[in-house]
């Protein structure tokens, strides 16, 4: 199929056609996480706390899969823009192979690390038991998950956003249906508790990958994924890793941040860890929507930059900025206006809801501020400038927020951690805006 529509179709309709399917799929994934957490919370608050403690390691593994997928996406889209179809085929094939290898490595490392990781934050044996049970079961599916992410990014790189949306919806649908059946033992299924939540997740991931494999067999992509092209090439792998490692670190920084914040909050009470975990489930709904726009934007920027359409790259950036700004404004309003309702989805304990209300109202203004950073970071990835994207994420998730959270928590208590979010977003937005302005002046 001819990909020239990426540089010929009007920018806003094109971005929406690329972005909306991904937004739907990303929001569906975030909603699944929320629904899954609600079911887990029905087991007990200990189970919910265990999920919050496990989340950083789970997110780290997810970051490795998605981050490398971003490298695949950027390189395939760029080679297609340059008219190098054979190299695009090699990139896609080698990307799928390496993603499977990454999944195997993640399974081994995750199983080895998780017992020690959990004991860093709690000595409660019930919470530790819940965490180990969930983690060890869900990580059995890591290879399937990383391969599914690789196929998703290949399909997105050629503009097949509706296909990737369908795959995510299938996986989430299977997951949500199986969650109550496996967790609570409906019908002939025995009650599996938190183990059931893990197996529902893994089976959903398997369903998504099977959808891609069957579809690609029945109706092959114009980018060919084949065994004969899977032998790693230094040039191709280097290109994928140069973007993929930076993108992985971008997303893995969330795990670093959560681990650090859990350590800061743990001396006050485990309730604060639970609230932080709930916040991250809720904010995922917002940022996954924004990520959908970025994923629609990224191949468009990569293709048009490769095709020498610099002015069109700038137009795509502006359109994406406008859309994400609307999403983030909506998120800020929800956090300010209905925090009790949002917290009440996960717990009915009055003291926990009160702490969550304070957290959401203090953190929410940072959503609007983060628009600049989110779009600039994604645009840099699309241009193959992974290091610039990484610098922005380092500021958002480590260099600024962690020291501020630590210092403020010592001065005003755990509330200081919530203030650190919006302060970090404000400072990073100024830097990201200036960095993008310099880039378009020099490179575009």
Positions of the model-derived regions?
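Short alpha-helical transmembrane segments in multi-pass integral membrane proteins
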Residues: 1-19, 76-143, 189-245, 301-366, ...
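Residue-level signal for short hydrophobic patches within transmembrane helices
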Residues: 8, 12-31, 35, 57-64, ...
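Residue-level hotspots within pore-lining transmembrane alpha-helices
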Residues: 28, 32, 61-65, 105, ...
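Small-residue-rich hydrophobic transmembrane alpha-helices
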Residues: 48-108, 145-159, 163-164, 262, ...
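Short runs within selected transmembrane alpha-helices of multi-pass transporters and secretion channels
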Residues: 69, 73, 138-156, 164-172, ...
